[in-house]
Design a protein with these regions (language model features):
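C-terminal "cap" of GNAT-fold acetyltransferases
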Residues: 142-164, 266, 271-277, 287-302
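A short beta-loop-alpha structural element at the N-terminal edge
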Residues: 2-15, 162-176
């Protein structure tokens, strides 16, 4: 017997531990972040947007939630092999779809809406529940990783460039750089408000890890990163198109490696869409490897 319950803030530690157990089951390494979960829950109506499943002993055996607005909604589903019983993923998916359609119906000013979800390449059960419920495979994403197995030297900065950390006056120029360079197939443009929510984490970021590169005063590169328990995480790395292929991206990435190495972190990771083949080939040349693959699913909402 499975019992579904809505979320409360008191569930956060328990849910995080379950997510980590799912990470370990699939990849042998934790990948879930308390800060990310706190940020996500801050944006949710916990009594309506999320659910946990328990067995008769009271153990947490499943988790699902819905987030988003303005026609763009996302669902997270966590099931654990073999702890989560067969069919639990369908119960959680039913709750998520019902709530996502409610949210879409409330957004009367949007022309269309869709629900996005992700499954790892090794989780057949999640892949099946998405596909059985009318989701299409939209694209694939790679987690790129580098592990620090020895000293990491700081690369010499080219004289042409000046380096600084982010300040509030940089916001519009930084957003324009990101949107002008993130133009690969399948990527939807973001409004500045959506980008701000994605990057600044409700104020939970450290400007030390938001590194900007200028040439003659013009912003030509940026690395927007976070220091997490598992290592450095580069959320966005951008180089102006007329500076690509000239070594700036390589230098900036290696600079971030050295920054996180000096913080005694074990490595650095980032995510990249498989359709952005130029980027992930570049990361591999720098010494990163693909540690995980995710399938992005999408489903139109009524």
């Amino acid at each position: 017997m499975t019992i579904l319950q809505t979320l409360t803030n008191t569930n956060l530690d328990e849910v995080l531990q379950f997510m980590i157990e799912c990470d370990l089951s699939e990849f042998g390494k934790a990948d879930s972040s308390r800060e990310d979960l706190e940020e996500q829950w801050d944006e949710m109506d916990l009594s309506k947007d999320g659910w946990i499943a328990r067995d008769v002993q009271g153990r947490l055996i499943g988790y699902g939630c819905v987030t988003g607005e303005d026609g763009r909604y996302g669902t997270d589903l966590y099931i654990h092999n073999p702890l989560s019983p067969e069919g639990l993923e369908n119960e959680l998916m039913g709750k998520c779809l019902e709530r996502a359609n409610e949210l879409a119906a409330q957004d009367s000013n949007i022309a269309s809406a869709h629900l996005t979800g992700y499954a790892t390449s090794v989780n057949q059960r999640l892949q099946q529940v998405f596909e059985q419920n009318g989701f299409d495979r939209f694209t694939y994403h790679y987690r790129m990783q580098i592990d620090f197995n020895g000293p990491v030297e700081s690369p010499q900065r080219p004289e042409e460039f000046t380096l600084s950390t982010y300040q509030e006056v940089d916001e519009t120029e930084l957003f324009q750089l990101i949107e002008s360079t993130f133009t690969w197939e399948g990527r939807d443009p973001l409004s500045i408000d959506a980008w701000r929510n994605l990057i600044f984490r409700g104020g939970r970021y450290d400007p030390e890890y938001f590194v900007l590169v200028r040439s003659s005063g013009r912003l030509v590169g940026a690395a927007l990163s976070y220091a997490e328990e598992s290592g450095g995480w580069i959320r966005q790395l951008a180089v102006a198109k007329d500076y690509q292929g000239k070594g700036l991206g390589s230098w900036l990435l290696q600079h971030m490696f050295s920054v996180f190495y000096k913080k005694n972190l074990p490595g650095v990771g980032l995510g990249v869409a498989s359709s952005n083949s130029k980027a992930w080939h570049f990361y591999e040349r720098i010494g990163m490897y693909r540690s995980r693959e995710f399938i992005e699913y999408r489903k139109p909402l009524a």
